[in-house]
Amino acid sequence: MKQDNQTGIKHKGEAKTARIPIKVVPLEEKLRKPEWIRAKLPTGQRFFEIKEILRNQKLHTVCEEASCPNIGECFSHGTATFMIMGDICTRRCPFCDVGHGRPNPLDPNEPQHLAESVAAMRLKYVVITSVDRDDLRDGGAQHFADCIQAIRASSPATRIEVLVPDFRGRLELALDILSATPPDVMNHNLETAPRLYKQARPGADYAHSLQLLKDYKTRNPDVTTKSGIMVGLGETDEEVLEVLADLRAHDVDMLTIGQYLQPSNGHLPVLRYVTPDQFKAFEKKAYDMGFRHAAVGAMVRSSYHADQQAREVIE
């Protein structure tokens, strides 16, 4: 059996992106990282406590799997974004550092392990995301719901944000399941402008992702909706504003915009570093358009300070 088809084998970097429709073409000379792109190094006992809890419960975080630059700061403050359903994704998005392959079966004990970890970490706000699971009948929606229910049972005061995949080909079923067990915040990222989807999000569809957000809001008007994009993949400022307008037209409440950073040479190159002034301009436009909260800046990620992002919207 070819290793590529074996269950549980994780491919990263060039091994992951080799088969995408539009190949990754590295720049002859990488753009120099500007001085405003700086991450804080992991420090403090709390960082290592979080790591130990995660390992003991056999849990994954997107902070680790996607090589997030903010991991030191978030772990040190006792926050983490849990990544359920394993650490192997069925998609090959060339901006993302999560591994690709044929995933293992779901762990039926994961919801309980997650709930125990949330309680042990004394989290007031938790973000749950996942790999894409195109191999599952419901795309993993029921597993999300099981995790929400388990956390509600053991930590009823904890606010829950879910960052979901697109549930391609099974959207209605997924919406039914997640409407029966709603989170406090429903997040699904558009990631980039529609012109760049074939290159950056092979297998995804811009209109479908917008429809997911709109349909969930229609079914659950009291649940806050959220989405985010990266800049630096080749989009123009005008395209960024067009995406923002599309999100507002689909009743999305909260927004994140951050700088794309290349995880490895096998990933899409950074084509521009957006300046702090331009991020401020995007933020102003977002509020002018009616977003209830906009987190905009070079180091912003979808779940970075998610508790602070949501506080003024859901309380």
UniProtKB/Swiss-Prot annotation:
UniProt cofactor note: Binds 2 [4Fe-4S] clusters per subunit. One cluster is coordinated with 3 cysteines and an exchangeable S-adenosyl-L-methionine.
Required cofactor names: [4Fe-4S] cluster
Subcellular location(s) of the protein: Cytoplasm
Pathway: Protein modification; protein lipoylation via endogenous pathway; protein N(6)-(lipoyl)lysine from octanoyl-[acyl-carrier-protein]: step 2/2
Residues given in the record as [4Fe-4S] cluster 2 binding sites: 89, 93, 96
EC number: 2.8.1.8
Cross-referenced InterPro entries: Aldolase_TIM (IPR013785), Elp3/MiaA/NifB-like_rSAM (IPR006638), LIAS_N (IPR031691), Lipoyl_synth (IPR003698), rSAM (IPR007197)
Gene Ontology molecular functions: 4 iron, 4 sulfur cluster binding; lipoate synthase activity; metal ion binding
Keywords assigned by UniProt, alphabetized: 4Fe-4S, Cytoplasm, Iron, Iron-sulfur, Metal-binding, S-adenosyl-L-methionine, Transferase
Gene3D superfamilies: Aldolase class I
Broad class of enzyme this protein falls into: transferase
Recorded catalytic activity of this chain's protein: [[Fe-S] cluster scaffold protein carrying a second [4Fe-4S](2+) cluster] + N(6)-octanoyl-L-lysyl-[protein] + 2 oxidized [2Fe-2S]-[ferredoxin] + 2 S-adenosyl-L-methionine + 4 H(+) = [[Fe-S] cluster scaffold protein] + N(6)-[(R)-dihydrolipoyl]-L-lysyl-[protein] + 4 Fe(3+) + 2 hydrogen sulfide + 2 5'-deoxyadenosine + 2 L-methionine + 2 reduced [2Fe-2S]-[ferredoxin]
Main localisation: cytoplasm
Keyword Transport: no
Pfam families: LIAS_N (PF16881), Radical_SAM (PF04055)
Protein name listed in UniProt: Lipoyl synthase
Species assigned in the record: Laribacter hongkongensis (strain HLHK9)
Designated gene of the protein: lipA
